[in-house]
């Protein structure tokens, strides 16, 4: 589950197995709950940070942000955390320098995030150097559905190398068949934002949309209900995992 920071009550009561949260948004109550989850993944929140800075017209202090990220990881002994994959903003060479500092000052390997712009050779290199990598670009449409077959083959390659792959922003029905070790997205909030609702029917999530021109009742109630249902779905998917590593 990703983006659960505003839903303390539901998360505490229903206890998801796996949680991803952005460093930019993470709350103290989530830190308290971490030990109860099977796995916690920390996203750098770099894009959110950058957009906030852009709105204020201030220069982006990447060194300062990275320093705070490192401090949080060390203070709370975070085991799984992503690099600052801001290639399209600062270039991949700068990303690699930040990754090197991140790993040197935490004493742990980060989860690098492969983007299509990095190329096939870099994907293979990451598979040689890291036990756990991410693939980004689904949520922002840099990877189109017509390219999913290619991505599936990349994941198969990584699995054959014994590498775990996280699909960032991908929770479609066929996520299990990709061979991803883990996936995340904030899909659980999407239909709620547009007035709809989603529920787990025992094997998949079903979306219920309001009649045209109407918006569903109380947003908070729908959001809490949707999160509960997605936690059920998460636990179901956990029994269906097909990671081959």
Walk through the language-model features, giving the residues of each.
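Non-catalytic, usually N-terminal nucleic-acid engagement modules in DNA/RNA processing proteins
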Residues: 1-99, 233-245
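Glycine-rich adenosine-cofactor-binding loop
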Residues: 114, 136, 145-182, 186
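Histidine/lysine/aspartate-rich catalytic loop segments that bind and position anionic ligands
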Residues: 112-143
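C-terminal accessory extensions appended to soluble enzyme cores
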Residues: 191-245
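Glycine-rich phosphate-binding active-site loops on the catalytic face of alpha/beta enzymes
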Residues: 24, 47, 137-139, 170-172, ...
């Amino acid at each position: 589950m990703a983006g659960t920071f505003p839903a303390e009550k539901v998360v505490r009561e229903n206890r998801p197995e796996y949680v991803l949260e952005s460093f930019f948004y993470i709350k103290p109550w989530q830190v308290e709950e971490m030990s109860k989850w099977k796995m916690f993944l920390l996203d750098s929140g770099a894009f959110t940070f950058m957009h906030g800075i852009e709105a204020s017209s201030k220069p982006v202090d990447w060194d300062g942000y990275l320093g705070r990220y490192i401090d949080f990881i060390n203070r709370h002994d975070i085991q799984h955390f992503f690099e600052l994959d801001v290639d399209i903003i600062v270039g991949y060479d700068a990303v690699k320098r930040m990754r090197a500092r991140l790993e040197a000052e935490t004493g742990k390997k980060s989860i690098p995030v492969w983007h299509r712009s990095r190329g096939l050779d870099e994907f293979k290199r990451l598979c040689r150097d890291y036990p756990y990598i991410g693939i980004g670009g689904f949520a922002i449409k840099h990877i189109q559905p017509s390219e999913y077959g290619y991505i599936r083959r990349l994941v198969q390659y990584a699995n054959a190398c014994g590498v775990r792959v996280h699909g960032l922003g991908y929770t479609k029905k066929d996520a299990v068949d990709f061979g991803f070790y883990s996936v995340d997205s904030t899909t659980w909030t999407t239909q709620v934002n547009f007035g709809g609702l989603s529920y787990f029917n025992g094997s998949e999530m079903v979306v219920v949309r309001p009649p045209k021109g109407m918006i569903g009742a109380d947003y908070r109630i729908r959001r809490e209900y949707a999160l509960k249902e997605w936690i059920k779905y998460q636990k179901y998917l956990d029994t269906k995992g097909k990671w081959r590593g």
